[in-house]
Amino acid sequence: MTSLAGAVPRMMRPCPGQNYPRTGFPLEVSTPLGQGRVNQLGGVFINGRPLPNHIRHKIVEMAHHGVRPCVISRQLRVSHGCVSKILCRYQETGSIRPGAIGGSKPKQVTTPEVEKKMEEFKRDNPGMFSWEIRDKLLKDGVCDRNTVPSVSSISRILRSKFGKGDEEDMELDRKEQEESEKRAKHSIDGILRERAPVSPESEEGSDIDSEPDLPLKRKQRRSRTTFTAEQLEELERAFERTHYPDIYTREELAQRAKLTEARVQVWFSNRRARWRKQAGANQLMAFNHLIPGAFPPAAMPALPTYQLSETSYQPTSIPQAVSDPSNTVHRPQPLPPSSVHQSSLPSNPESSSAYCLPSGRHGFSSYTDSFVPPSGPSNPMNPAIGNGLSPQVMGLLTNHGGVPHQPQTDYALSPLTGGLEPSTAVSASCSQRLEHMKSLDSLSTSQSYCPTYSTSGYSMEPVTGYQYPQYGQSAFHYLKPDIA
C-alpha cells in the first residue's frame, strides 16, 4: 500500500483476534466462556455460575461419610460458604440443585390431581402423617422431586379439606413434628426403599435431575468444651514451647490430655488470638508511659521545677564558628508586647541583645530566662539599660525569686553538633561581650545555659533590640507570675 509524499498514512484495520491458548496466567483459566477464575484455595470457579453437579455430589457424599465441612472445603478447593450452603439446602429439601439466580422462588401450586391423591391416601389411612403422604406420592409416581409438595403444604391442604378442630390440628402437628425429628426427611428407609423405578430414559437425562439420596445427620450445636486444670497446664506448657504445633505434636498432646486432635487445634488457635491481644495491649501501655510530658517518669529528676539535675553528656569540641562572637546569634524568648515594640533597628548584629537561656537537658522549656542587656544603648529612651542594671535587679532576674541554684556544668545547644556541649568557649564569648559592664561581673560565673546558633546554618536578619521598660521588674512578673 503506497501513499503520497507528505500525506498522513491511515491506520490499517486490525485483523481478527486469534484464539491463542491461555497459559501461564494464574488468575484466569481456559474455559469455553473465558470467565474462569481461581479462588484463594486454588479451585476453579466461574463468577455468577453455580458449581458443577459432580462437585455438589461429592460434597454431599463426603458429608454423609462424616467429613467436616472445613475439610471438604480444603480438599475440594471450594469456599466454606459454598459448602455450607449446599449442605444446608440438601438438609432442608433433599436436593442439590442450585437455587434461582436472582428474584424469589416461584410459589409451587399443587395440581387438583395431586390433591385428590392426597385425599384418597388420607381416607384409606386416617392416621397417615404428611411426610408419609409425600413419600407415597413419590413412590406411586404421582409427583417427582421437582413437583412434589412440601410437608407443610400437605398438612395445610389436608387441614382445609377435612376441617378438623384446632385442638386436633395442634395435636396432629405436634405428632408430625416429633415423628419428623425422629427420622430424617430423606433417609435411606424413607427414600431409597420406596423410590420408584427409574426408566432408562430418565437415566440418560442431565445429572442435575439425579440426587444423591444420602442421609445427613441433623446439625446440632456443640456445647463448649470445659478443660480441667491438668489439661490446661499441659496445653500451656506446649504453648510455651511453640505457638504452631504440627500434627504429630497435636496428636501426642491430645493423647496426654485425653482430648481430640481437633479440640487441641482449636485451643491453640484461640490461645494465639488471646496472646496477640495481650501483646498489643502491653505495647500500648509501654507507649502511654512516654506520653505524659513526653518522658518516662523515671527520667525526671526529683528537683525543683526550674532546676534540673546535672547531666552526663560527653564533652565534645565546639566549632570555631560558635566561639567567634561575630558569628553567633542568641535566640531570645518571647517578651511582653509592651517591651517588644521598638521604633528603631540596630545598626549591626552586635547591638542585638545577648540572652543566656537556662535550659534543661531535654531542650528548651518554659524556664525563667536570665536576660543580659545589649553592649550599647540601642534605646535612647532608656539609658539605664545601656549603663547596666543594678545588682539588686539582676539578682532578682538570676535567682528567680529565691530559688537556690545548684552547681552545674554549662552546656550550649549548637545546631552544628546536634547535642548539648560544655559551653567553655561560649562562656568566654559571653564574657567578651560583657567585659565592659562593671556591674555584671558576677554573671561570668553564673550557672546559665547559652544556646548559640551559628550563622553558617541560619540566615540572619537585623533583629529588633528587646528592651526592658522603665518600670523595672514588671517583665519578670509577666514571665513568671507563679514565682513570688
From Swiss-Prot:
Tissue distribution of the protein: Expressed in the dorsolateral ectoderm during early and mid-gastrula stages. At late-gastrula and neurula stages, expressed in the lateral neural plate, becoming progressively refined to the neural folds during convergence and extension. Expression is also restricted in the A/P axis, extending into the midbrain but excluded from the forebrain.
DNA-binding region: 34-161, 220-279
Sorted UniProt keywords: Developmental protein, Differentiation, DNA-binding, Homeobox, Neurogenesis, Nucleus, Paired box, Transcription, Transcription regulation, Wnt signaling pathway
Any single Pfam family the record assigns to this protein: Pax7
Renumbered residue ranges of the record's region RED subdomain: 113-161
Region (PAI subdomain): 37-93
Family: Belongs to the paired homeobox family.
Protein name, as recorded: Paired box protein Pax-3-A
Organism: Xenopus laevis
Lineage, uppermost ranks: Eukaryota, Metazoa, Chordata, Craniata, Vertebrata
